[in-house]
Amino acid sequence: MNKPLILIGGGGHCKSVIEAAEIAGYSILGILDMPEDVGNEVLPGYKVIGTDDDIPTYVDQVEFVITVGFIMNPIIRIKIFNKVKEAGGKLATVVASTALVSKYATIGEGTVVLHHAFVNASAKVGKNVIINTFVNIEHDAEIGDQCHISTGAMINGECKIGERVFVGSQSVLANCITVGG
């Protein structure tokens, strides 16, 4: 497979995505991060090769995945998402090999589904979403664009999560709950 990929953001979330992307068949060419981090290694063999100002340089060569985390506010992730799209870039959808996504589920562009997550039949996950480790998204649940469903959260059947929502670690939403717009 060996699809070329550049990660945008060099913090902890980046470290979590690297192995998932490798196993999913991506060849990571490098990481874009802050100017002061250019040349630094995020993990052995994975260097910061530039900043998000370099996105237009790579749009014809690679796909991108946003690896800036989101806990308090998704604004940085949204700005980077828009910057990639405005430059004509393509955002990869990365699903870890240990995750299970039903063939009847829908996953939006730029979304990352990490290890041991489960997305059940008829679930819909929007664009640029983080589905973190051990998350369970049950049948007919809907996750809006630009969300972060944190480690171990359980989103039960027919729940609706609006856009730009953070669901914290180990949160449990009972069936048919709506959170956010």
Name the predicted role of every residue range.
Residues 2-3, 28, 59-61, 88, ...:
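A general structural motif
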Residues 18-20, 77-80, 125:
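Short amphipathic alpha-helical segments
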Residues 39-100:
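Phosphate-bearing ligand-interacting subdomains
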Residues 93-181:
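Structural signal for interior beta-strand "rungs" in well-ordered beta-sheet cores
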Residues 1-43, 49-51, 56-57:
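Hydrophobic, well-ordered beta-alpha structural blocks that scaffold small-molecule cofactor pockets
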Residues 12-13, 72-75, 106:
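Short alpha-helical
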Residues 15-19, 75, 145:
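Alpha-helical elements of the RecA-like P-loop NTPase motor core of helicases
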